[in-house]
């Protein structure tokens, strides 16, 4: 029997009230790891050390495993402690009817996001910005302006305001609402100051509640052609606040950016198991959230980085598989261990840019330097590198890509425990003119030379 109607966030809410009861510990510690392990064995998944896959049969098995993971497990609602299940037809209905392209921004600054494929010769969209990193109120505008001034950058992804009017943006407080609005307004002003007033932005990042997220759609703030973020929870979980936010975005005809960062070494387990969950999470973004695009970001449980050998492999296989078997549009976010003004940070970001570009990502989003947790440690220079490397990578043979990545990751992977802290934005840039220091330009050139030595042609 066919499904009654296409699934949406309202159906999710209704099913979250009546679905099968389950404790969160049972979900996290039993259902997710056991099913991921079972599916890895069932489909004989073995990535054989490739960052970007060349085995289409193995990719097809991965897609089947990810689809089955979502179908059989469903999604756990953390508020009701119940499991929301979809039918197979509901999942296929969502996959078959995704947005195949959309526009971010307005006027001459608008960019068209459309499907890429594995080994595509076209450079992906570069979404430059702090990527949820904490940014001081007094430099919030110049930090974001440093990205808008970069021609390699197409859209902006917001940072988190550490304060507004000198007060912390406590969730569900008036200050959170003010911060969510101010975040968007200041970034729009930063883009205008850079001569790109129509640039699309992606957020909000400061707010942690539904009321904060919804309030960012305001006069002078986010508009429908900006990416509006909603986040899934690890792994295959969601709360009802997020479902309410989705309802607002849908009702406002907003571009919806569904975000989630699968954890390697966490509930899902190893490389293949985490990739199965990543594929399931991609698909869920379009069933549950009616997403325009999904923002990925496999992260290492120990190092807090998206640029490790393991997380790059997960990202490469998940994206290539999604790209090969669906029309889903996908991005990835960047969290290097090292801080700005260091070669390691730039090389880490480069490795991920190579992986994402070659595996068919539509959007690269970053860079949250110093793992995205240190205040003011992110600048436009890291996004420049992300973009330049993407341009150099597009169209290169996948066999060559895997060789370059193996050598590149080897240059920095022994330094995670002692990654260089780097410098703050205020130390990397002239804050008044929003231009990088001579020191940073020298560091940048050094990293670029190492990439050229590995075979990239800029």
Curated annotation (Swiss-Prot):
Pfam families: MtmB
GO molecular function: monomethylamine methyltransferase activity
Pathway where this protein functions: One-carbon metabolism; methanogenesis from methylamine
Keywords: Methanogenesis, Methyltransferase, Pyrrolysine, Transferase
Reactions accelerated catalytically: Co(I)-[methylamine-specific corrinoid protein] + methylamine + H(+) = methyl-Co(III)-[methylamine-specific corrinoid protein] + NH4(+)
Gene Ontology terms: biological process: methanogenesis; methylation
EC assignment: 2.1.1.248
Subunit structure of this chain's protein: Can form a complex with MtmC.
Family, per entry: Belongs to the monomethylamine methyltransferase family.
Biological function: Catalyzes the transfer of the methyl group from monomethylamine to the corrinoid cofactor of MtmC.
Name of the featured protein: Monomethylamine methyltransferase MtmB1
Originating species: Methanosarcina acetivorans (strain ATCC 35395 / DSM 2834 / JCM 12185 / C2A)
